Amino acid sequence: RYVITQTLLVRSTQPETVAAASQTVSELVSEGVVLSSGEQYGSGGPTFVFTGLNKLKPAMIAQATARAREAAQQFAQDAGSALGGIRQANQGYFEILPRDQAQGIQEASQMNKVIRVVATVEYLLKD
């Protein structure tokens, strides 16, 4: 009996193709190849890493800031006040999450991601 260990790194702009290819490992199993993932037997499947965050950051910050202003305007209107200028603003950290939240399924194993940022903007109110 022989044990061969190999890790394959694939960089692709077509993650759907990589996911489809990973689904064909059952053919290897039917030929008698034993696959392992760490300490457990069975294929671990591909890991999907999102690398385009820097391209999205400016638009996401602009959108978060615009939504903060809309919420502040509504708050001011409901309070019978007018919205003043920005008192303070902080950009939170960017978070990459799995699109589908499921117990035991990690973000990296899911091809589709959700990216979020929280911007905290404090406005002054005018009476």
How would you describe each model-predicted region?
Residues 1-127:
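Short, charged, surface-exposed interaction patches
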